[in-house]
């Protein structure tokens, strides 16, 4: 039984991020617990039936995905050329996804870089760290980040560093030297979005950099496609400007007094509460002195190596606070970091298993689904989405693990399995969570937040339009963003209408029906945007609603989704009983 409890702890929310721990505030704790049904339903006959169905259906889903993508399928010759030699039981591996292939092929190199970076940091910390977890004023952590980051950028992007520097320079000038608050905000956003289009149109241009070319040509670094990772750089650029503009507006002419507070805080004398013991939410708007918004911290933040390639996203205020003022207690708990590393390793091995036994990415690239049943096509799409989830989760967790070892605690990006979602709103809170928090802080709240009625829809439309453009300047992704907003409308409307009936016995079952509709709509939106494209989606919809076998599958799968939704509801009820409410 002890082994089961340890296993449960390993896969709990709390292991991922201390931000997900039960609240310590007794009033909030009781209010969260009161939301839950005090009696667990796991031992009831209803849920025993649900769990039995789950045990039967999940293996059938795996079997269908394997049959539609393995060498026994008649379409195998059409995608065989995309497979590579694997290392599990002599099987081929589907390494055809460009993004994950880059990560997978360079994984040993990344591990070596992590070892070098963390070792250097520990050696330097031996000389500069103060026992109470704060830092020496003579040599701040950000100095090391600045030096290492510049070296890393040159090694990664070579001569293309000049192109990145151009955007950094323009953005810095906008933030620091446009003194009108609204104009600075507008210029920051306009240039930020323009830079995405600029890179799309002119990213491969030399811009006169040929003067640096030697006989062997450009040195473009280990990662020549600098523009692929620029999107994350842009988020940090915007964060610096918007944090600075907001802070400058609040401070007015009182920066001199705050500089004095900063000095007192570092030296430990009469520590002011403004810069001590801030939690993760308070760090987002940490009352930093204006002189912390300098070019050195700007470049150090932009080029912070553990999070540079793909995040998770951490705001400028949070980064500087953790770097130069107070280290997060999470980064000093090595047992927790070890458990996080074990969980990362588990996810990595699951990904390797799926890539060796389900070639769904190769199938989707070649559209090799002729003759497949609606069940098989839907499983191709579903496991494709699972692989997309894993290909994002694994790098994010590796980079977050790297940051934790380095003493910085960024938010966890993925706190739910992709299949453990029934709400479109909650899905976006759990998927790419740090980006979601960034969007809420810098776009959603400034635009008016949730509000009511049409304004909530308009804000959501603006948010998902930016999200789509930020991912890639491609029409199908913009359509995906608008589809998501359209699919949000029924959920928002139903929540407003039926939430007052939440004490009725039938409310849970009504929510289950709504969850089934939500899951279908989310799958359609994401399959169009990221997996099957419009061709594959239209074929699936045609087979579902214009063939007998498809109609039968639609009914059975909807029943299974209802069962899954009820299990998801009870999982969240179990969390509420432990005073955990992550709202997703």
Curated annotation (Swiss-Prot):
This is Membrane-bound O-acyltransferase GUP1. InterPro entries: MB_O-acyltransferase (IPR051085), MBOAT_fam (IPR004299). Its main location: membrane. Belongs to the membrane-bound acyltransferase family. Residues 1-41, 131-145, 204-295, 365-373, 531-550 are extracellular. The gene is GUP1. Disruption phenotype: Changes ergosterol plasma membrane constitution and distribution and presents an increased resistance to azoles. Impairs the development of hyphae, adhesion, to invasion, and formation of biofilms, all of which are significant virulence factors. It comes from Candida albicans (strain SC5314 / ATCC MYA-2876). Keywords: Acyltransferase, Cell membrane, Endoplasmic reticulum, Membrane, Mitochondrion, Transferase, Transmembrane, Transmembrane helix. It comes from the Eukaryota. The lineage of its organism: Eukaryota, Fungi, Dikarya, Ascomycota, Saccharomycotina. Residues 63-109, 167-182, 317-343, 395-456, 499-509, 572-584 are cytoplasmic. It is found in: Cell membrane; Endoplasmic reticulum membrane; Mitochondrion membrane. Membrane-bound O-acyltransferase involved in the remodeling of glycosylphosphatidylinositol (GPI) anchors. Acts only on GPI-anchored proteins, but not on free GPI lipids. Also involved in lipid metabolism, having profound effects on sphingolipid-sterol-ordered domains integrity and assembly. Involved in cell integrity and apoptosis. Plays a role in virulence and antifungal resistance.
């Amino acid at each position: 039984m002890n082994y089961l409890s340890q296993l449960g702890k390993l896969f709990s929310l709390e292991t991922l991020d201390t931000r997900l721990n039960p609240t310590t505030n007794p009033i909030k704790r009781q209010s969260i617990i009161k939301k839950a049904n005090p009696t667990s339903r796991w031992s009831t006959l209803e849920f025993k039936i649900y769990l039995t169905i789950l045990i039967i259906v999940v293996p059938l889903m795996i079997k269908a995905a394997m049959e539609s993508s393995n060498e026994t399928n008649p379409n195998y010759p059409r995608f065989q050329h995309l497979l590579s030699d694997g290392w599990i039981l002599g099987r081929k591996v589907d390494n055809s996804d460009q993004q994950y292939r880059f990560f997978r092929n360079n994984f040993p190199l990344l591990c070596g870089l992590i070892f070098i970076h963390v070792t250097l940091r520990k050696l330097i910390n031996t000389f500069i760290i103060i026992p109470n977890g704060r830092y020496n004023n003579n040599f701040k952590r950000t100095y090391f980040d600045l030096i290492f980051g510049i070296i890393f950028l040159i090694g990664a992007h070579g001569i293309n560093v000049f192109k990145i520097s151009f955007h950094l320079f323009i953005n810095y000038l906008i933030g620091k030297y446009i003194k009108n608050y609204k104009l600075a905000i507008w210029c920051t956003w306009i240039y930020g979005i323009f830079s995405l289009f600029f890179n799309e149109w002119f990213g491969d241009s030399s811009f006169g950099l040929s003067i640096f070319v030697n006989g062997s040509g450009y040195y473009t670094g280990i990662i020549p496609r600098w523009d692929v990772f620029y999107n994350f750089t842009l988020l940090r650029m915007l964060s610096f400007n918007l944090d600075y503009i907001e802070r400058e507006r609040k401070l007015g002419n009182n920066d001199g007094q705050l500089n004095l507070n900063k000095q007192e805080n570092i030296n430990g004398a009469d520590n002011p509460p403004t810069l001590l013991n801030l939690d993760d939410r308070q760090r987002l708007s940490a009352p930093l002195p204006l002189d912390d918004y300098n070019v050195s911290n700007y470049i150090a933040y932009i080029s912070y190596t553990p999070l540079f390639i793909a995040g998770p996203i951490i705001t400028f205020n949070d980064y500087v606070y953790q770097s130069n003022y107070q280290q997060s207690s999470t980064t000093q708990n090595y047992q927790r970091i070890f458990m996080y590393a074990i969980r990362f390793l588990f996810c990595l091995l699951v990904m390797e298993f799926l890539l060796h036994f389900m070639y769904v990415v190769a199938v989707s690239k070649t559209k090799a689904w002729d003759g497949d049943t609606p069940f098989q096509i839907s499983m191709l799409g579903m496991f494709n989405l699972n692989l997309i989830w894993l290909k994002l989760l694994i790098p994010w967790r590796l980079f977050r693990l790297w940051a934790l070892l380095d003493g910085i605690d960024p938010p966890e990006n993925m706190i739910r399995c992709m299949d453990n979602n029934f709400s479109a709103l909650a899905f976006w809170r759990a998927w790419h969570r740090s980006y979601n928090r960034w969007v809420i802080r810098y776009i959603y709240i400034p635009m008016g937040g949730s509000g009511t009625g049409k304004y909530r829809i308009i804000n959501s439309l603006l948010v998902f339009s930016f999200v789509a453009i930020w991912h890639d300047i491609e029409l199908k992704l913009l359509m995906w963003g608008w589809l998501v907003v359209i699919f949000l409308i029924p959920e928002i409307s139903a929540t407003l209408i039926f939430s007052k009936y939440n004490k009725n016995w039938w409310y849970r079952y009504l929510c289950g029906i709504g969850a089934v509709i939500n899951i279908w709509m989310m799958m359609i939106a994401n399959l169009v945007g990221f997996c099957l494209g419009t061709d594959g989606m239209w074929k699936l919809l045609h087979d579902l609603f214009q063939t007998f076998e498809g109609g039968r599958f639609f009914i059975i799968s909807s029943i299974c989704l209802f069962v899954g939704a009820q299990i998801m509801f009870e999982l969240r009820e179990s969390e509420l009983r432990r005073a955990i409410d992550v709202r997703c």
